[in-house]
């Protein structure tokens, strides 16, 4: 998350610096300035209407995630094995020599899995392996972004550069719904689930006690705001065609895109056996979305079990720090670091409304 905030700050500084630099550039000549004055058409002297144009594009993208279910606590540990194809549809308009806006709709999938990503022999990742959580989240995003080209083109689209790097910043709303596969049974009570293996929504279950009213958290919303920012480069391939490569991060205002944020809660507070089973999966004999066998020899060499009496009067046996809110190291996720997701895209776009002069009759 610190890396994301750093890139966000750099994007802001680049926008301010580039805008200021362009504003201070001297005119080409007195002759050019006189020519501009004779063509005055309004307040935007530098980029009149006949130079502006609109464009539409389609992208193949990949969404990746960094959060509580990443292999380690740094963004470079993002597991690219969970990259899944998605798409983006976009429409924009260039209205200055080096700035333009874009509205876009993106769809893609985020995934995370402790069993596959966390190495039980790694001292940093072994507790994630014990935790044994996983999720899948389909993202639908609507974004409005402002883009700044780092190379100015004061001419029409026909004279745009062959390569143009750019940075962008904007606002977005996205819909999400984290899901996980249902286990065979609740390891605490032996309750058998008829829909074992199905993907079910985690938000209604309140896996961190959101539905109990006893913890300082509320059910998270499935529609959330975000701040998209990033950079890209555009290659001109024909008079009206461009291809672009872009990477953008989404700064989020919550920490539940993976349904993991705070600590474990008292398992005796759950009335729903499904919610209890999804809250603490550390003792399941299989791991991850693919339900592969786990190595308990490694787990027992790392931690030991602990039994406590829950709020419902039943006894629950958990690993130390997993499932009991009485344990000092009872951490399910890191509430201090918000999740982020990253969209990497390859876009093909076409200029659809170039200005065309009409012949005037005398």
Residue ranges: model-predicted function:
Residues 99, 105-195:
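Gram-negative (and chloroplast) outer-membrane scaffold detector with strong preference
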Residues 58-60, 89-93, 144-150, 169-173, ...:
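Residues on the lipid-exposed face of transmembrane beta-strands in outer-membrane beta-barrel proteins
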Residues 43-44, 72-81, 127-135, 154-155, ...:
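Extracellular loop and loop/strand-boundary signature of outer-membrane beta-barrel proteins
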Residues 27-28, 147, 337-362:
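Outer-membrane beta-barrel "beta-signal"
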Residues 65-66, 98-101, 153-155, 240-243, ...:
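Repeated loop/turn-to-beta-strand initiation elements of outer-membrane beta-barrel proteins
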Residues 52, 81-85, 138-142, 163, ...:
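Residues that define the transmembrane beta-barrel architecture of outer-membrane proteins
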Residues 21-55, 155-162, 311, 327-331, ...:
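Outer-membrane beta-barrel biogenesis signature
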Residues 48-55, 59-90:
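Surface-exposed strand-loop-strand hairpins of Gram-negative outer-membrane beta-barrel proteins
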């Amino acid at each position: 998350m610190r890396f994301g905030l750093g890139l966000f700050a750099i994007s802001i500084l680049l926008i301010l610096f580039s805008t200021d630099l362009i504003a201070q550039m001297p005119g080409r000549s007195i002759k050019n300035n006189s020519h501009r004055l004779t063509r005055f058409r309004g307040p935007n002297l530098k980029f009149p209407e006949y130079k502006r144009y609109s464009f539409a594009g389609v992208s193949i993208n990949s969404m990746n995630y960094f959060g509580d279910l990443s292999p380690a606590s740094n963004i470079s540990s993002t597991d690219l094995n969970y990259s899944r194809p998605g798409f983006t549809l976009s429409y924009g308009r260039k209205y200055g020599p080096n700035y333009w806006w874009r509205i876009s709709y993106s769809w893609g999938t985020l995934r995370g899995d402790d069993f596959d990503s966390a190495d039980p022999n790694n001292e940093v990742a072994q507790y994630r392996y014990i935790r044994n959580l996983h999720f899948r989240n389909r993202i639908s995003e609507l974004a409005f972004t402002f883009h700044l080209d780092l190379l100015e083109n004061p001419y029409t689209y026909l004279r745009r550069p062959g390569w143009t790097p750019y940075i962008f910043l904007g606002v977005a709303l996205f819909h999400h719904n984290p899901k996980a596969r249902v286990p065979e049974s609740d390891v605490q009570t032996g309750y058998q689930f008829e829909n074992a293996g199905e993907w079910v929504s985690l938000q209604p279950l309140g896996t961190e006690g959101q539905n109990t009213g006893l913890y300082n958290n509320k059910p998270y919303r499935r529609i959330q705001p975000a701040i998209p920012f990033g950079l890209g480069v555009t290659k001109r391939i024909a008079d009206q065609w461009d291809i672009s490569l872009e990477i953008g991060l989404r700064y989020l205002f919550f920490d539940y895109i993976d349904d993991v944020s705070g600590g474990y809660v008292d398992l005796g507070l759950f009335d729903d056996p499904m919610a209890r089973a999804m809250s603490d999966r550390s003792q399941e004999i299989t791991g991850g979305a693919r339900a592969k066998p786990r190595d308990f020899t490694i787990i027992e060499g790392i931690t030991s079990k602990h039994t406590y009496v829950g709020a419902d009067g039943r006894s629950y046996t958990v690993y130390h720090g997993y499932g009991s809110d009485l344990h000092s190291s009872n951490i399910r996720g890191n509430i201090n670091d918000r999740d982020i997701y990253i969209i990497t895209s390859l876009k093909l776009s076409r200029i659809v409304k170039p200005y065309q002069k009409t012949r005037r009759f005398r």
